[in-house]
């Protein structure tokens, strides 16, 4: 495929040439017709169930919507019936990319809109269809100013490890021009300066089944697991910390073992998530192995065992650009697709709604938050583009001085 490319500097000037030079008034709400379209788009997205691995229907609907609104759409297959959606205007290679995810966590909760309180809820209403809809409306309202130098990417699989974004990152047909990438997640309408890293792992204890009346004839996997978790509880106090991100946390998300109260447990498992505030995954991995060393040795001496299985390589803290005037800033403890997209680019993280209600049975936000997100995304796009132009101009001036 032949891709249309333009020199980086000319892209910056061409984009800025169409941006109004006088300050733009910041209304508190969108105009009625745009707000109505936003509400419709958000409702359709939330109404369409898209729990991870089941994103086909929402992807098909969103593709039709974007094509109807004059976007060129490409679908990248991630796995059977699961597609990332890349949308752009007159050119495929753009400087600016807006991206979020269209999958949600289970279970599905239906859409609702309380017109008395103007609260809108349902699964994905915040995380992250609350970002997807405003991104699209914001891009449609500003792409003319930017001479179509903006594109959209909506990925699958963010909630279970980011297979969609990783697939896009390694896609041979991935556009190579993106220099400003804005990610959408619930951030309370603040710019995020970074988030914690992640290291997930599982423990598996193996014992020997026996009648509970004669426990000495067996080896309790549950006992092994309890001892292992006890050592990890002690380790929590010694995990890395930082001023910016606080303490590294370790959550015992799921623990199970045995088959009945009157049977010595033959197996036990635990799934654990560690949110890194400092250090590296290798450092914390070493701490975990060290903390469990004696438990593993003792279990083997009894005829049992304790194994650690790592969910992935993990990643350290993720620093994110937040140098745009006019936005409040924060750091967050949850993970995103930001580290899953490789490349040398400015990356921003913003979205309406709060992570505190995401993944819950009361996931919701106010309609005014959706409207304001459109205005904020537009402002973020323009400010980031202006900053890029200034940096390019400064670089050009420095090069001329050196000559």
Regions found by a protein language model. Give the residues of each.
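Acidic-glycine-rich active-site phosphate/pyrophosphate-binding loop
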Residues: 102-116, 178, 193-204
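Metal-dependent amide/peptide-bond hydrolase catalytic core
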Residues: 18-36, 74-77, 202-403
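Acidic/His- and Gly-rich active-site-bordering loop/insert found
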Residues: 2-3, 13-125, 144-146, 349
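Short, surface-exposed alpha-helical segments at coil->helix boundaries
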Residues: 56-60, 132, 285-289
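Short, conserved micro-motifs enriched in small and acidic residues
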Residues: 120-133, 219-222, 367, 371
């Amino acid at each position: 495929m032949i891709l249309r490319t333009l020199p980086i500097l000319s892209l910056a000037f061409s984009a800025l040439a169409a941006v109004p030079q006088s300050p733009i008034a910041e209304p508190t709400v969108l105009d009625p017709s745009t707000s109505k379209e936003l509400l419709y788009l958000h409702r359709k997205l939330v109404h369409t169930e898209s729990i991870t691995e089941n994103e086909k229907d929402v992807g098909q609907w969103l593709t039709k919507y974007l094509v109807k609104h004059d976007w060129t759409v490409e679908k990248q297959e991630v796995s059977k019936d699961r597609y990332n959606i890349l949308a752009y205007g007159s050119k495929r290679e753009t400087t600016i990319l807006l991206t979020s995810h269209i999958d949600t966590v289970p279970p599905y909760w239906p859409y609702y809109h309380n017109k008395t309180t103007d609260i809108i809820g349902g699964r994905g209403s915040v995380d992250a269809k609350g970002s997807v809809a405003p991104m699209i409306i914001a891009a449609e309202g500003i792409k003319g100013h930017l001479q179509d130098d903006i594109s959209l990417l909506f990925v699958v699989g963010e909630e279970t490890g980011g297979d969609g974004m990783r697939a896009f990152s390694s896609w041979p047909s991935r556009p190579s021009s993106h220099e400003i990438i804005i990610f959408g997640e619930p951030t309370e309408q603040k710019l995020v300066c970074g988030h914690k890293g992640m290291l997930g792992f599982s423990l598996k204890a193996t014992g020997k089944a026996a009648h509970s009346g004669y426990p000495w004839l067996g080896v309790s996997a549950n006992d092994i697991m309890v001892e292992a978790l006890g050592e990890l509880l002690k380790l929590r106090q010694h995990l890395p910390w930082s001023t910016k991100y606080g303490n590294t946390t370790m959550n015992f998300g799921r623990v199970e073992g045995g088959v009945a109260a009157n049977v010595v447990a033959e197996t036990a498992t635990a799934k654990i998530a560690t949110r890194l505030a400092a250090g590296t995954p290798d450092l914390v991995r070493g701490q975990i192995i060290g903390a469990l060393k004696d438990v593993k040795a003792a279990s083997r001496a009894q005829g049992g065992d304790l194994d650690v299985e790592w969910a992935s390589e993990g990643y350290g803290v993720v620093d994110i650009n937040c140098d745009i005037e006019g936005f409040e800033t924060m750091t967050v403890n949850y993970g995103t697709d930001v580290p899953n997209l490789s490349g040398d680019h400015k990356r921003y993280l913003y979205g309406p709604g709060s992570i505190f209600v995401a993944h819950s049975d009361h996931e919701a936000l106010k309609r005014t938050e959706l409207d304001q997100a459109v205005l904020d995304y537009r402002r973020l796009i323009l400010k980031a583009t202006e900053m890029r132009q200034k940096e390019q101009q400064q670089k050009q001036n420095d090069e001329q001085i050196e000559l």
